[in-house]
C-alpha cells in the first residue's frame, strides 16, 4: 500500500529520531555558557549530523543541589550526561560523591592542551574527572561614567588594597546612589579573595578555619562590603545580571566571562572599564589577581 505524503513524512521523522545521538547538559549564563554549548553543538554536528545537545539552563546552586539529592538517594537517572561546575566545588564534590563522576584520564582527551592551573581544579589524586571549560581570570569591571561622577578616574581603582578600595567605593556610592559592586550571592568573591593571597579554606582535604588569617580577613572584608552598602548580594542570577545592565550597581568582581553579560546592554557601550581586583590588607603574599571559572 502506498503511503500518503503525511505518512511518509512521519516515517522519515521517526527514522531520523531513531538515529539521533542526544546528550543532555546542564549549564547557566545564556550569554556565555549556554552560547558556548550551542557553538560546540554546531561544530560537532558538521561531522556528526545526527548529534543533538539538549541544553538545559539551570543556575549553579540548583545544579549542585540536584547532584547532592541524586547522590544521597542513589538515583542517578535524574542527572544529565554533562554538567558545568564551579572550579572551587570540584574537589569537594568528587570527595563526597565520587559515584557521580566519570574518570576521564584514559578517555583519549589530550589534557596537555590545558594549563596546569585549570587542570588542578578537576584533577584528584592524579586522575581527571572533568574538562576545563574557561580561563576565568578575575576582573573588576567598573562603570567609568559613575566613577567620574564621583570625581575619580578608572586609574584610581588599579592595584588597590581592599581598604583603599572601600574609601573610593564610598564616594561612588554617595555620588550615584547605587552600590559599587553587585554579587551573585555565593561564596565566589570570598574564594577569589583567598586565591588572590594564595590561600584556601581547605588544608589536606579538610576545612581549615583556625589560624587561617586570609580567610578571617576575607570574611571581614565581605561583611564590611555588605554592612556599608558597598556591595549588594543577589541569589537570583537574572537579577544579578540585571543589576549591571540596568545601572543598579557601578561594578562587579567576577571571572572575565562576565563581560559577555555586560556587553548585552548595548546602551552602555563605552561606559565600562576593566581593572584588577583589590588585594587583602596585611596578608603575606596578597596580590590583585585571582581566578573564577
Task: Spell out what each predicted region is.
Residues 18-30, 51-56, 81-82, 129, ...:
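Short, well-ordered beta-strand elements
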Residues 1-24, 46:
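Short, low-complexity disordered leader/linker segments with a strong preference
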Residues 46, 52, 122-188, 200-235:
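Helix-loop-helix "hinge/cap" segment bordering the ligand-binding cleft or interdomain interface
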Residues 46-47, 52, 73, 224, ...:
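Extracytoplasmic/periplasmic substrate-recognition and gating elements
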Residues 43, 47-114, 149-151, 250-251, ...:
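Extracytoplasmic "Venus flytrap"/periplasmic binding protein-like
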Residues 30, 84-89, 186-187, 237, ...:
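Beta->alpha turn/N-cap motifs
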Residues 61-65, 199-265, 269-271, 275-277:
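Extracytoplasmic ligand-binding clamshell segments of periplasmic binding protein
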Residues 16, 84-139, 166-168, 197, ...:
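Hinge/lid segment of periplasmic solute-binding proteins
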Amino acid at each position: 500500500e502506498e503511503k500518503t505524503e503525511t505518512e511518509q513524512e512521519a516515517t522519515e521523522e521517526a527514522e531520523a529520531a531513531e538515529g539521533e545521538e542526544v546528550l543532555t547538559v546542564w549549564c547557566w549564563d545564556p550569554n556565555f555558557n549556554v552560547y558556548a554549548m550551542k557553538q560546540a553543538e554546531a561544530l560537532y554536528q558538521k561531522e556528526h549530523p545526527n548529534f543533538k545537545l539538549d541544553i538545559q539552563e539551570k543556575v549553579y546552586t540548583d545544579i549542585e543541589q540536584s547532584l547532592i539529592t541524586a547522590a544521597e538517594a542513589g538515583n542517578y537517572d535524574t542527572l544529565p550526561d554533562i554538567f558545568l561546575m564551579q572550579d572551587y566545588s570540584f574537589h569537594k564534590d568528587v570527595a563526597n560523591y565520587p559515584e557521580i563522576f566519570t574518570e576521564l584520564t584514559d578517555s583519549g582527551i589530550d589534557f596537555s592542551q590545558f594549563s596546569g592551573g585549570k587542570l588542578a581544579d578537576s584533577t584528584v589524586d592524579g586522575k581527571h574527572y572533568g574538562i576545563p571549560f574557561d580561563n576565568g581570570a578575575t576582573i573588576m569591571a567598573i562603570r567609568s561614567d559613575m566613577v567620574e561622577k564621583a570625581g575619580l578616574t578608572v586609574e584610581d581603582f588599579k592595584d588597590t588594597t581592599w581598604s583603599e578600595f572601600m574609601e573610593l567605593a564610598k564616594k561612588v556610592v554617595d555620588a550615584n546612589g547605587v552600590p559599587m559592586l553587585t554579587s551573585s550571592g555565593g561564596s565566589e568573591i570570598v574564594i577569589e579573595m583567598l586565591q588572590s593571597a594564595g590561600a584556601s579554606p581547605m588544608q589536606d582535604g579538610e576545612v581549615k578555619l583556625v589560624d587561617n588569617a586570609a580567610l578571617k580577613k576575607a570574611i571581614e572584608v565581605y561583611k564590611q562590603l555588605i554592612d556599608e552598602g558597598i556591595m549588594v548580594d543577589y541569589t537570583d542570577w537574572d537579577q544579578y545580571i540585571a543589576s549591571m545592565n540596568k545601572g543598579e550597581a557601578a561594578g562587579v568582581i567576577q571571572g572575565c566571562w562576565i563581560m559577555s553579560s555586560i556587553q548585552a546592554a548595548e546602551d552602555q557601550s563605552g561606559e565600562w572599564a576593566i581593572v584588577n581586583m583589590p588585594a587583602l590588607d596585611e596578608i603575606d603574599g596578597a596580590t590583585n589577581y585571582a581566578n573564577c571559572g
